[in-house]
Amino acid sequence: MIRLHRPQRPPLRAPLRATPSLSLRWRVMLLAMSMVAMVVVLMAFAVYAVISAALYSDIDNQLQSRAQLLIASGSLAADPGKAIEGTAYSDVNAMLVNPGHAIYTAQQPGQTLPVGSPEKAVIHGELFMSRRTAGDQRILAVHLQNGTSLLISKSLKPTEAVMNKLRWVLLIVGGVGVAVAAVAGGMVTRAGLRPVARLTEAAERVARTDDLRPIPVFGSDELARLTESFNLMLRALAESRERQARLVTDAGHELRTPLTSLRTNVELLMASMEPGAPRLPEQEMVELRADVLAQIEELSTLVGDLVDLTRDDAGQVVHEPVDMSDVIDRSLERVRRRRNDIHFDVDVTPWQMYGDAAGLSRAVLNLLDNAAKWSPPGGHVGVTMRQLDPSHAELVVSDHGPGIPPQERRLVFERFYRSTSARAMPGSGLGLAIVKKVVLNHGGMLRVEDTVPGGQPPGTSFYVLLPGRPLPPAGHSTPAGESETDKAEAATDPAVPVAGDTANSRESANVISVDSQSARAR
């Protein structure tokens, strides 16, 4: 017995919980508070260091001045004891050391002038002068020329009291500064983020009520530009919904007419087959069946056109090398079966594209059907493809039909648009829209002109610019009547711009020449 061991799938990881986060207003306010607190702390340290250095420097200057005054007066040599006693007062202590003879001291009650290693080095003559802080006293020791040493100290308690008060003042002022910065930051943040709040409310309103009204724009700063971008998005969404609603409405209208006619014919057929019902003449039965089949075919074509036009299957379409000569030949075979009274003048240069073969075939077939439908019986339809440059060729499909009025040229590629003269002709108004979509998806361009400008009738010519590369001739002849002048004019024609990539061409609205845009709705 064979057992199949299926690999165990790792357990699914539980979704991460949404962690609470501070609002943008609080984050901006905390950032402002942090910056102010940092500046306050740095300034407090700087002020404290400067004032502390100034106070200690002042004490050193006082001790230095008193020592110089005693030395310059000569009282230390005349009466050292009295001079030392006169020097010591308040918070100052003094000492005169004469090695081998005597030591004179004058100290305040409760204070003792400390003698450490620096002072001993001065007394022994190893150092000329020393200054240091010992405990709560600042000590100055000076070695005199006669071998004696003068030591003077001053209490630092008054200075420490001042520094303590300074620390409290800096702490209070810094705290008040941070608090003021927090309040001011909150007010500024609230005022600065008011447009963001309006934008947020508008987005929530759209999500809640589907209200696509634009948001008022104030100023010209970054938030104003953000609001304008949001308004553009709202307008695009409104236009998309409008197009969607119009598509549904138009599709329903276009489907209603053949469905109504089909239903009427089917009901008539069913009624004629009821027992006891009068039989329809055979000729009428044949015509009725033909009408039903024609209406079913019309419905199938309309539904297929709608599916091709509305679906976005860019990720499912297989792109492959496509020989446009074969595409044109197959399309011509299908059109000739429907309109065998039309003469097609074909002059095609072998050309290869990389794209969707089915989509390109549908676009070419729609162009040929369009030209054949509007050509009079026995008329001629021209189908030419010529190379413009190493990477672009131009397909031209021309007829000698009635043409299109200039005021309708901007509308012929819209879905379901049909001109007044086209309403009496069969069709759904989707053929040219499909052509436009396919051409743009393949990085091509469209332009439409009169076949015979000023003629009666003027006819219509569709010019399709297609990217690709030439193929060596294989059973197809190159255009014989094309001169070098024609090639130069085609290469420099300003109405034939070179298409960019597919994405850019798909989004461009100006791919159809405005001045020369003419076609008829099918």
UniProtKB/Swiss-Prot annotation:
Annotated ranges, domain HAMP: 190-242
Catalysed reaction equations from the record: ATP + protein L-histidine = ADP + protein N-phospho-L-histidine
Cellular location(s): Cell membrane
EC number: 2.7.13.3, 3.1.3.-
Bilayer topology annotation: Multi-pass membrane protein
Region described as Disordered: spans on this chain: 468-522
Keywords attached to this entry: ATP-binding, Cell membrane, Hydrolase, Kinase, Magnesium, Manganese, Membrane, Nucleotide-binding, Phosphoprotein, Protein phosphatase, Stress response, Transferase, Transmembrane, Transmembrane helix, Two-component regulatory system, Virulence
Domain Histidine kinase: 250-470
Residue ranges of the TM segments: 31-51, 168-188
Intervals, Extracellular compartment: 52-167
Residue list for modification Phosphohistidine: H253
Entry GO CC: plasma membrane
Alphabetized GO MF terms: ATP binding; phosphoprotein phosphatase activity; phosphorelay sensor kinase activity
Residue ranges with Polar residues bias: 502-522
Cofactor(s) for this UniProt protein: Mg(2+); Mn(2+)
UniProt PTM comment: Autophosphorylated.
Cytoplasmic side: 1-30, 189-522
Function (record text): Member of the two-component regulatory system MprB/MprA which contributes to maintaining a balance among several systems involved in stress resistance and is required for establishment and maintenance of persistent infection in the host. In response to environmental signals MprB acts both as a membrane-associated protein kinase that undergoes autophosphorylation and subsequently transfers the phosphate to MprA, and a protein phosphatase that dephosphorylates phospho-MprA.
The name this protein goes by in its record: Signal transduction histidine-protein kinase/phosphatase MprB
Organism: Mycobacterium avium (strain 104)
Gene expressing this chain: mprB
